[in-house]
Amino acid sequence: MLTLPDFPLPDARGRFGPYGGRYVPETLIPALEELEAAYREAKKDPAFLEELDHYLRQFAGRPTPLYHAKRLSEYWGGAQVFLKREDLLHTGAHKINNTLGQALLARRMGKRRVIAETGAGQHGVSVATVAALFGLECVVYMGEEDVRRQALNVFRMKLLGAEVRPVAAGSRTLKDATNEAIRDWITNVRTTFYILGSVVGPHPYPMMVRDFQSVIGEEVKRQSLELFGRLPDALIAAVGGGSNAIGLFAPFAYLPEGRPKLIGVEAAGEGLSTGRHAASIGAGKRGVLHGSYMYLLYDHDGQITPAHSVSAGLDYPGVGPEHSYYADAGVAEYASVTDEEALEGFKLLARLEGIIPALESAHAIAYAAKVVPEMDKDQVVVINLSGRGDKDVTEVMRLLGGEL
């Protein structure tokens, strides 16, 4: 049966080394303490774990395959490439692993209203889905720019019974939607559960989201031993806030020996030198955003700079505290690829494997194109295919002018 692993970090104060913590208004501290206590209790409750396991299997469609991408492996001519097919989950992305867990926790705590922020709309759709499943009232905050880019997901959320509130402030993207969601939570904290979509925000969110997503890496461990009798040599995943990557990395990150190479791929947007990117680790500085100390993008005046990526799910101007810690401690390495490279990865996977990936996942494919050819043929690389690309096809068509 499913267990939620006990990792060595965060510490009792919710810190990963210097990162993480709880930088929030006093009014939210009791709510976060209540949430942490409820989560720690649920994590040890066999009935909660059994129910989560049931919904992950019967509703979401776990376990997902670890698929040998033979044509892609041949094309690159280096290591053998395996894809962790999170794109095959119900709702089309890894987000459902976390939203099911948090919705069950909300119900357990007696909260009948859930709120969420969303960028690409995948998390919003996922929250609207579990709210419908468990009969919860649902409000999703989404930046106006993302509402434009992801019209299909907006309609999906409404179809599932959620109220979508467009946010016109700031850059009108994920950061601004998150600000509004936090404001709502402060106002309605007694009745409302905030389902945060990534490994960001104040403690216990980075820990909780990681634990719910770690099913990805735990499955990869088991499947690797079954398929090729050992652990992979490298794991590659796209990093925005960082939940799909942490879900893959965490079960390997704390291994005393034999840890695969962990590679997180950030969005370089139009190039790191242009200022139009979302590479918080690659080009950011340490600071506090949305209740957590982590790597961020901000200017000389301390103002958060707008993140840019072709992928709506990666344009968050920060990266989770555990990734920030991994980067400093050398547990994982972080690279970045441009919009242009990601679009090439998007097309490549479609043509060689018959799989249209999400633009987020296409960043991981694009970086793999640089490292896999340099590896030996008997080595194994696992790429986390965090979501499917249906939601992105219209935007890609617009960007490429309909020309492939």
UniProtKB/Swiss-Prot annotation:
User: Which keywords accompany this UniProt record?
Assistant: Amino-acid biosynthesis, Aromatic amino acid biosynthesis, Lyase, Pyridoxal phosphate, Tryptophan biosynthesis
- Cofactor(s) needed for function: pyridoxal 5'-phosphate
- Residues the record lists as N6-(pyridoxal phosphate)lysine modifications: K95
Q: Pathway of this protein?
A: Amino-acid biosynthesis; L-tryptophan biosynthesis; L-tryptophan from chorismate: step 5/5
Tell me how this protein assembles. Tetramer of two alpha and two beta chains.
Q: Which reaction does it catalyse?
A: (1S,2R)-1-C-(indol-3-yl)glycerol 3-phosphate + L-serine = D-glyceraldehyde 3-phosphate + L-tryptophan + H2O
Task: Give the enzyme class.
Answer: lyase
Name the UniProt record assigns to this protein: Tryptophan synthase beta chain
Name of the gene: trpB
| Record EC number | 4.2.1.20
Q: Name one GO molecular function term.
A: tryptophan synthase activity
A matching Pfam family? PALP
Q: Which organism is it from?
A: Thermus thermophilus (strain ATCC BAA-163 / DSM 7039 / HB27)
Quote the NCBIfam families the UniProt record gives: trpB (TIGR00263)
Instruction: Please give the GO cellular component terms listed in this UniProt entry.
Output: cytoplasm
Protein's job: The beta subunit is responsible for the synthesis of L-tryptophan from indole and L-serine.
Q: Which family does it belong to?
A: Belongs to the TrpB family.
- PANTHER family membership: TRYPTOPHAN SYNTHASE (PTHR48077:SF3), TRYPTOPHAN SYNTHASE-RELATED (PTHR48077)
